[in-house]
Structures are given as structure tokens and as C-alpha cells.
A protein has these predicted regions:
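Rossmann-fold NAD(P)H-dependent dehydrogenase/reductase core
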Residues: 2-184
Length: 184
């Protein structure tokens, strides 16, 4: 029996629950969406690239016939996108039973977000925290709602350098990644 089949047996019914998963167009995020959809959850795929998101939505519908699923655009490296996506979710969904913060960025060359933050800290920490905060009123009004945050064992190697959060005094792609995972 495969790992995901074992996990499927352990997941309780999610019938009637709305679950948003960031970065769910591929990898762990997509498999999480698939397993939860098989248990009856309504899935919101949130990802940056809408073409890849549409493909993930089609794949999910093919693998889980009858699934209630939708796609929203979310670029965690752009706080305006974060605000727009949260507003769209709040406007279109009366409840949100779970937010799974899965999206993240790992070890790119030094880059900045649209808001001029170091890319990994801006995406993995600031974008995710802003998104969660903006959705908190909807989560709070949903009985039993949960927020799940994926991280990495790389956090063990991280330190929070408050004097260099924006990588202006030097940059190590792994150091910045580990710092962002520790901050999660």
C-alpha cells in the first residue's frame, strides 16, 4: 500500500468543508488537495501561475470526479495580490474550514518581491502571514476552522538576523531559506 493510500484511510470525512491550499497546483499541495477532495472537501487551489492552476484544476477534476473545486490567483511575493485574493475569498465563500499554507520558495538567487523584500522572507513569511491575517475574520467565524503551515527541517539551520532581513548586508540562498522556515 502506498503512503498516500494509507493517509487517505486516516483522513476523516471532509464533506461540506471548504479548504484553501496555497501552491496546490503541484507537488505536496496538489496531492493534499486530491486526498482532501477524495474525502469530500470543496477545494480552493491558490497559485501564482493561472495556466498551471487551470491544468491542476483539470487534473483534480479528472482524478476526483464530482469534486467542487475552484482556482484563485495568489502571488505571495506581491502584497497587492495577497490582498486581492483574500478579498475574493471572503466575498465568494461564507466559510473557510481550513487554510493550508503550502506555497513557498526555496533557495533562488537574490531577488526582491514586488514590495522590495528579500524574495524568500517576503514570500515564505510576510506574504503567508499577511494572507492568513486577512483571512482570519472568515476563519474565526467558521466553527472549528484550522490553519496548517508547512515548513521544512531546514529551520534547524536558521537564525533570525533582524539586522539583515532584507539581505542588504549579504545573502546566502540557503541561509535565507532556513531563516524563512524558522520564522514560519
Amino acid at each position: 500500500m502506498k503512503w498516500n493510500e494509507i493517509m487517505l484511510e486516516k483522513i476523516a470525512s471532509q464533506q461540506g468543508k471548504t479548504i484553501l491550499i496555497t501552491g496546490s497546483n503541484t507537488g505536496i499541495g496538489f496531492e493534499t488537495a486530491r486526498l482532501l477532495a477524495l474525502k469530500g472537501a470543496d477545494i480552493i487551489i491558490a497559485c501564482r501561475n493561472q495556466e498551471k492552476g487551470q491544468q491542476a484544476l483539470a487534473d483534480l477534476r479528472a482524478k476526483v470526479p464530482g469534486v467542487q473545486a475552484s482556482l484563485v490567483q495568489l502571488d505571495l511575493a506581491n502584497l497587492e495580490s495577497v490582498r486581492q485574493c483574500a478579498a475574493e475569498i471572503i466575498e465568494n465563500h461564507p466559510t473557510l474550514d481550513a487554510l493550508i499554507n503550502n506555497a513557498g520558495l526555496a533557495m533562488p538567487p537574490l531577488q526582491k518581491t514586488a514590495d522590495d523584500f528579500e524574495m524568500q522572507f517576503g514570500t515564505n513569511v510576510l506574504g503567508c502571514f499577511a494572507f492568513t491575517g486577512l483571512l482570519m475574520p472568515l476563519l474565526v467565524k467558521t466553527t472549528g476552522a484550522r490553519v496548517v503551515w508547512l515548513s521544512s527541517v531546514a529551520h534547524w539551520r536558521g537564525t533570525i538576523d533582524f539586522d539583515n532581513l532584507n539581505a542588504e548586508k549579504g545573502y546566502s540562498s540557503f541561509g535565507a531559506y532556513a531563516q524563512s522556515k524558522l520564522a514560519n
